[in-house]
Every structure is written in structure tokens, then in C-alpha cells.
Amino acid sequence: MIDVSIHYEIVTEDNIFSIKELCNDLMTYQKSKANIHPEFFDNMSFETRMIPSMKSSKENYIVAAIDDNQVVGYAYSTIAPKTTYSGGFATLQCDAFFDFDSVKTDDVGCLSQFFIKDNYRNTGIGTELFNMSMKWLKSFEEISDLFIFVSNGNDNALKFYINKGFKVSHQILDGFITVLRNR
């Protein structure tokens, strides 16, 4: 563990490129962990995941952890129509991410991306990013269904979210993604 003096900033759409490198690092990290179709990550990047997600969502929230003017972690959350989660994931085609009939409203909340540089893990940054994201998601009183999609092989992330109260719902893309839900 390193000695960190972290502060947190909301990343606006105008400043979105400040997390581009970390977003691409997330795709590389997920590929390194994957034991089911790691090649699926080959075409995933800031341009193919972050930008399209921001455009298709009704609301976006990005919070960055910053150490000495360097972004060392971020969390990206969305409020989007549930139909956004039908027919594909980034550059992949699949059935719906979840049973639409099980969702009470037309919109859902999602903790969509979450990444912390290796040297900054297990320092409390993840918990702070998670808590800030959940506070934002829960500020939408009409949204009762929250989802997190965890790539296969990322067991530490899966345990982290389960310890935060999310439950495994099901898998999609033949186990490539595990869907977690708040209820």
C-alpha cells in the first residue's frame, strides 16, 4: 500500500478525455483477467465503450480519484432507458442484459465502469468511488433497479460488489459478463 493524499472530482463531459487512458487501461485489465473470450476486449476502448454509453444515457456521472494532479481511478455511472441494455454490449451482440419485466420503471441505474490503478488499490479509494456513485444513483428516487456488469475473471471486483450488498443475478454472453443487481 502506498501513502496517498487523494481528492475526488466530478468529471464533466467537457473534460471526459481526462479519463481516456484509464478507460483503455480498464479494457486491458479486463482482458488480462478474462478466461472466457478475452478476445472480445480487442475492439473495446474509450471510443467504443465510454463515448457511446454517454450518448445513449439520460444522465451520466463520472467521479475521478486524483493524486498529485494525476487521475488514478474513476467510476462511471448512468441512468438509461432499460431498452438500452438490449441487443448488444459495446462491440458485441447479445440478448437483453436482464429480464425487462423484472424492472419496475422505464429507466435503470448502472455502475458502468470502475477502475483504479494497481498501486492505488486496497487504499479505500474504491469504497469512496463506489459510495459517491451509489449516492448519485440513489438520488434518482424513481430508479429502484441498479445493475453492475462484471467481466469474467475479475473475481476481486465481483467480491467487492457482493460485499457492498449487490447480488449475482445471472450471466450473459455465455459467462463473459456476470450481472449483479441491487435487489
Question: Model-derived features: where do they sit?
Answer:
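A short helix-loop-beta-strand connector motif used in the catalytic cores of GNAT acetyltransferases and
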Residues: R49-V63, P81-Y85, C110
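Conserved acetyl-CoA-binding loop-helix of GNAT-fold acetyltransferases
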Residues: Q113-I116, N122-K135, N163
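Conserved GNAT-fold acetyl-CoA-binding loop/helix
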Residues: T28-M50
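Conserved active-site alpha-helix within GNAT-family acetyltransferase domains
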Residues: T127, S139-E142, N152-H170
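Conserved N-terminal entry element of GNAT/NAT acetyltransferase domains
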Residues: M1-F17, E21, D25-T28
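Conserved acyl-donor/pantetheine-binding loop and adjacent beta-alpha core of acyl/acetyltransferases
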Residues: I79-C110
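Conserved beta-strand-loop-alpha-helix junction that forms the acyl-donor binding cleft
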Residues: D118-R121, M132-S133, L146-L158, D174-R183
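Conserved GNAT acetyl-CoA-binding A-motif
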Residues: V108-G109, L137-S151
